[in-house]
Amino acid sequence: MTGEVLLGSAIAIIVMAGCYNTTMFLLSRRRTRRVRGPRRKRLYVFLLACLNEEKVLAESLARITALPAGNFLALVIDDASDDGTADIARAADPERVRLLQRTLPNARRGKGAALNAGIRHLRESGLMDGYDPHDVIVCVVDADGRLDEHVVQSVDPFFDNPSVGATQVGVRMYNRHQGLLARLQDMEFVIYGDIFQCARRYIGSVGMGGNGQFMRLAALDSLAVPGQEAGPWSDSLTEDLDLGVRLIARGWTNQHCTAAAVSQQAVLDVRRLVRQRSRWFQGHLQSAGLVPLILRSVPTRAAVDLLYHLSSPVLILLTSLLPLSFLVAVAGTAIGSVQAGRPLITPMWIIGPYVLSFTAAYAYGFVYRRRERGLGLLRSILLSHVFIFYGYIWFAAGWWGLWRMLTGKQTWLKTART
């Protein structure tokens, strides 16, 4: 009986997720009409929060300073690094790159704290004096982020609409050719962007990522809490998710740009990848505190999607019981077969789980092939079948993240660069 209950519950969750994914896929195929206002000359400010990033920072700064955009600057926020991060920033183009060095004990308190310090520094330094906050666009870029050359030209038209507070670009893995694990991470971000983020443009619930998020300074200012100087970013382990939800609650529109992307380094070690995802998972658990704000301030359609998104940690933990419940059911059926003297296992034991688990793989393969023409449709679909198993990484990360939260561990688990 217990095995049947577990199996039935897991199947119900998978069916619900399948219906949701199908809806998002269909919505993502729709075209959204862009509302435009008068073109404005804007200042673009790129923020890079860095903690021991000497291995990757130089290439990222070189790409930013080479952008064919007229009015921009980059601020490297050195969060008390022990390596040559600050030296790399100093060696970059002094006309375009500025350095803020934070020191202990105020440093190393999370990415959100570092970004808030960066915004305060920009204000105090006078670099944004004379600019209307509506015409200053702040972009958060990871130290390993490599922005497409045309990213500013692709993003800028979104901000012609005065109601747009933020725009997220796509995310790719620049080392996706270095093995299967890197390729699957690239597929993961393409699927998330081209299906779920695109669908959320129609729903009104586009989320922000920690890399390649462009935000209007006026929108960030609207998140300020009277009497506090902390800044727009929270201390959540997923400060990007938190910020995106609060922007929507403030009445701003978040957009997703499919015409440009930021490429980052894929994690090539399974243990490091699970460690990274455990931090993201823990941050999602922390975001449960946003539920009252969503219920109170977000329009119904967007609120339903955001609540489903925030419930994903619980769904992941419950779904992780499916392999166990399936084994229990198989064992029970095998015992029953012995007792009955005939096999009770039918072809549906194979067909049913395949349909439940792998139907989405065909949509994922179709979408990924549009980004990676060199793979071909058949290879993309085969890869998407492997991608389904890759998703099991979230099961390990989920239980690890839950354990860290229950034991009170809130430190920033930084992903090591290679």
Language-model features and meaning:
Residues 142-146, 247:
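The conserved acidic donor/metal-binding loop of glycosyltransferases
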Residues 62-71:
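Short, acidic, metal-binding catalytic loop of nucleotide-sugar glycosyltransferases
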Residues 241-262:
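Catalytic donor-sugar/metal-binding loop of nucleotide-sugar-dependent glycosyltransferases
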Residues 103-104, 108-133, 149-237, 278-289:
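Long helical/loop segments within the catalytic core of UDP-sugar-dependent glycosyltransferases
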